[in-house]
């Protein structure tokens, strides 16, 4: 049986060389992409950590997990739904969790869903507890809890950072599993580029400020309904941002500071890339690259000033569009010859790392909720059946698609752009709001405060969103109570700045809104 290495990154938008970003240096992830099938149009089902992770790890949508906030455990609150690692464990795999896989806290029962999901207790890096403490040296020489936090690693508590510790632990587990009779499922969850941007300061050198531009559409668009806007409260709480005294809810953040946020996000991505590089290089050294599927994705994107917005918490592409790629030995790339390395470590500071061509790509719209059936299918396990509606009583079923057909190539020289009919495909996302206007809890409303749900569909041609009344006691959306709508056409308005909703009463689109 093939092993699985699932790499989940926190808050990573597709700002990667393999997704066409010319600025960001991500040679190791690009190298993985060159041996993988990469999905150009993959979307998360809700752009916030806990709901997205519970959704894709169970293969069910947020309306089924009933988790839109950070305050409940799906097995108690919605249904006893199986997870990806649980399914692999029940099929004879040793399942292991390193770093941030499930969102910690009540949403995974304070145990990362143990013992259901994991063969032994999940690993959390000891230095994680300093992530939000005052460890950033400010211009005044004092330590602060800042948003921008490039550090000298020898100076920080424990002399290390969480993602470095997670990589080391994951490599140790791979060494252990090399001789194991059972196949393994190893999930590795990286923290960066999640805020605060606490990363080794040398990565800043890759992105001189004079090379950093603002978002091409850094103003709040005229036609944006206020309910669609997220006021990025989490950023405002950091000491360096507080000091700027930015007006609520729309800002803007001063231009110079916008550049610095973008610089630190990209630097965090390059730091993350080195950790992924070390992990994949170890997989190679242990001769596991010919027997291990590698899946790489993120829980959602992150706005970097587009539409005058920052962070996640919205239905825009910048918040919902994620990287998604699968390396399948012998299928997406030829098996490595003896002694050949598929994943030699690449140094982002080495200017010789040429931009690599991605391997195979699919332009089809896909959803993170399809990760479960796809990993099961690639590993040769039985693919869980489609869920009935409703499916609260069904423990094992899938609301996503099995993407296996994308991996059926006759030979490796075939056209790397896979044919499909993208016109038929839809990716669904949603986001709750407590009010029609942005307020202190608009980014992360608690279930009891949700008054409006924004249901959004993304096709190859458009993104269409309606914000409708929502009753949190009954978990019921009222589609006749429309608070606002958005419609953006991808070809003419790729950045989603010109809301065409009022011009085109989207009646025919309406029946598409429910998966």
Enumerate the predicted regions with their spans:
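Formylglycine-dependent sulfatase
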Residues: 1-479, 494-512
